[in-house]
C-alpha cells in the first residue's frame, strides 16, 4: 500500500454548505511506529495517537487538494476544539500501522473527523478516535467554512449520521 495515499481515487462531490453529511469513505495513511513514540512498556505512548490523527487528517485533506498550509495562507484555520481516543490494543515499536480517516459531519462552521488505527495488514482496531474542528479567522473569531473547502473535502449533501 502506498503510504502517501497517492493514487487513491475518491469522488469529490460538489455541494454548498449544509447541516450535515453522510460519512465519506476512509482515506488510509500507512506509517511505521518509531522508537521515540513508545513508552517503557514498548507500547505507543497514548498521546502519540493524537499526532497520528493529525497525520491522517492532513493526508486526507492533501489527497483532496485542501492542503493545510495553503488554507492557512488564505486565512482559513481549522482549530481543534475537541479530541477523543478509545484505546483497544497497543501498537508497538516498528509496527506498520494504518490511520483510517474520514469526515463524519460538517456544519456551517465545524468539521468532524473520525479515525481508526489498525495494523496495516489487518482490520483489527487498535485505537478509534474523533476530532472536532472550528473554522476560524486569523483573529480567532469563528467563520463559515468556505464553499471551496467543503467541495474539496468531498462530502455529500445528506443528513448527519
Which residues are covered by each model-predicted region?
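HotDog/MaoC-like acyl-thioester-processing domains
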Residues: 14, 18, 25-29, 62, ...
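Generic structural detector for well-ordered beta-strands
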Residues: 30-34, 86, 134
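Residue-level recognition of specific faces of alpha-helices
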Residues: 49-52, 77-79, 114, 132
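Hydrophobic beta-strand-centered segment that forms part of the acyl-chain substrate-binding groove
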Residues: 60-111, 127-128
Amino acid at each position: 500500500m502506498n503510504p502517501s495515499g497517492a493514487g487513491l481515487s475518491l469522488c469529490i462531490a460538489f455541494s454548498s454548505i449544509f447541516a450535515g453529511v453522510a460519512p465519506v469513505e476512509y482515506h488510509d495513511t500507512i506509517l511505521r511506529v518509531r522508537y521515540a513514540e513508545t513508552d517503557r512498556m514498548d507500547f505507543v505512548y497514548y498521546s502519540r495517537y493524537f499526532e497520528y490523527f493529525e497525520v491522517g487528517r492532513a493526508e486526507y485533506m492533501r489527497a483532496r487538494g485542501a492542503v493545510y498550509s495553503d488554507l492557512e495562507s488564505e486565512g482559513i484555520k481549522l482549530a481543534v476544539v475537541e479530541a477523543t481516543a478509545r484505546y483497544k490494543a497497543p501498537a508497538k515499536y516498528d509496527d506498520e500501522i494504518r490511520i483510517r480517516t474520514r469526515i463524519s459531519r460538517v456544519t456551517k462552521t465545524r468539521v468532524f473527523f473520525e479515525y481508526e488505527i489498525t495494523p496495516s495488514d489487518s482490520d483489527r482496531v487498535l485505537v478509534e478516535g474523533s476530532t472536532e474542528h472550528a473554522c476560524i479567522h486569523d483573529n480567532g473569531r469563528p467563520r463559515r467554512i468556505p464553499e471551496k473547502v467543503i467541495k474539496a473535502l468531498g462530502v455529500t449533501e445528506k443528513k448527519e449520521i
